[in-house]
A protein has these predicted regions:
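N-terminal pre-domain segments of enzymes
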Residues: 20-84, 382-391
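Primarily recognizes the serine-hydrolase "nucleophile elbow" in alpha/beta-hydrolase
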Residues: 201-266, 292
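Cap/lid segment of the alpha/beta-hydrolase catalytic domain
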Residues: 136-219, 252-255, 259-261
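C-terminal catalytic histidine-bearing segment of alpha/beta-hydrolase fold enzymes
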Residues: 333-334, 338-391
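Non-catalytic accessory segments flanking enzyme active sites
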Residues: 52-123
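Conserved strand-to-loop "acid loop" that flanks and positions the catalytic carboxylate
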Residues: 308-326
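Mobile cap/lid helix-loop segments that gate and shape the active-site cleft of serine hydrolases
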Residues: 248-303, 324, 328-332, 340-345
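Short beta-strand element of the alpha/beta-hydrolase
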Residues: 118-121, 128-138
């Protein structure tokens, strides 16, 4: 009798998970579904408890209906303690136009100042519009061959139009970037909050113009980038729910790699003490340096989890120790539990393979990327279950 009851309960659980999965969207038509929720209390860093393990991303979540609020709380924590505020924008503050057939121009006006974003859409030679779109943060480092014979348009988000910081070229300092002209009170922001804001404004422009004018299918937008731009892609994908697929390539510390795990590493990795602080709030280093990292109320697995229920693929390269891929793997496995909890584990995966240059995706990793692109940008019935490759 007990055995029969266990079988019935197992079948019932599987049936409920399957039914729930069918009702969970692949993407949304708004930037942030959690706007209706008030931010949680944000204690002073000295009042935060010590949490040695990776914090529970599913805290207070009993089912998918609870996820939007939990995701909103994570969103607020990351902004408050980590990267700074990504301000919301009213629709009337954005004016978009197509200049010719391929150039998207988006003007964003705030507080009497206007910031202009420009990007060229490169349309595919196959298929018919509206097309799926892959946006590269700074550039698309994925091999061109992955897009050549697929009906996917591509474009680049030129991040310097928002915050022109660069490790290698002349740039402005905090408070002097184009973004800061619109929001001078947010001059202490890290670049990742501002870059995420900028990419969202490009999507606003596409949404405003509509698919007839842009030839873009708004339900099939992806974002990708590598290294510092891999971090950027992850923040952009996490903070804008109109993005159906996020592919973060070799994002390193401050991207997918958990700060706690990087801190515990015996190797020279990018940890919370050794990263580029133009990207983050200076207060993050002041408040969470050294063992104080255990008082950080979230970790990077929760940034990854913010992408849920949409699709996320993390790509690593263990040959580059600085990237802290062991910490990324720990983060990926913890984040995966969120998708798994809702019966949609096939929407999240990772591939960590060495033997190649930085940001040079080898052919051995092409199948994972192709599977995610085909399913989540093209809507093909590609199997993305158990894409969890690691060396």
């Amino acid at each position: 009798m007990i055995r029969i009851l266990c079988i019935v309960l197992t079948l019932l659980t599987a049936t409920m998970a399957s039914a729930q999965k069918k009702n969970i969207p692949l993407v949304y038509n708004v930037e942030n579904t959690g706007m209706r929720f008030a931010p949680p209390a944000m204690p002073h860093p000295t009042q935060l408890p010590v949490i040695r393990q990776l914090p529970n991303a599913l805290e207070g979540v009993n089912g998918f209906d609870d996820w939007s609020k939990r995701r909103s709380n994570i969103c607020h924590m990351i902004q408050h303690y980590g990267i700074g505020t990504k301000p919301s924008v009213e629709s009337g503050q954005v004016v978009a136009r197509m200049q010719g057939d391929t150039a998207l121009v988006v003007n964003v006006s705030v507080n009497g100042h206007t910031l202009t974003l420009r990007s060229t859409i490169r349309y595919p030679k196959v298929g018919k519009p509206p097309y799926a779109l892959m946006i590269g943060t700074s550039m698309i480092s994925l091999p061109k061959q992955l897009f050549d014979n697929r009906p996917i348009a591509t474009m680049t988000f030129h991040e310097f139009q928002v915050n022109d910081y660069s490790q290698w070229r002349k740039h402005h300092e905090r408070g002097e970037h184009p973004f800061d002209q619109l929001y001078p009170h947010l001059k202490d922001n890290g670049a990742y909050s501002e870059w995420a804001w900028g990419l969202s404004r490009l999507i606003d422009g596409l949404q405003q113009l509509g698919s007839t004018r842009t030839k873009i299918d708004m339900s099939r937008i992806g974002v990708t980038g590598c290294s510092y731009a891999g971090k950027m892609a992850l923040y952009c994908g996490a903070f804008d729910e109109r993005i159906a697929l996020t592919i973060a390539q070799e994002p390193g510390g401050g991207g997918a790699a958990a700060w706690r795990k990087s801190h515990e590493s015996k190797e020279k990795v990018e940890d919370i003490d050794k990263t580029d602080y133009h990207w983050f709030l200076e207060s993050q280093r002041e408040n969470f340096h050294g063992d104080s990292v255990y008082q950080l109320p979230y970790d990077q697995h929760e940034l990854c989890a913010m992408v849920c229920p949409r699709a996320l693929l993390l790509i690593g390269n263990p040959d580059y120790v600085w990237l802290s891929d062991a910490a990324m793997l720990a983060s990926a496995k913890e984040a995966y539990k969120v998708w798994e909890r809702f019966g949609i584990g096939d929407r999240m995966g990772w591939s960590i393979v060495g033997g190649h240059g930085h940001c040079q995706l080898p052919e051995s990793q092409w199948p994972e990327v192709q599977a995610f692109i085909d399913r989540f940008l093209l809507g093909l019935k590609t199997d993305t279950r158990n894409i969890q490759k690691e060396q």
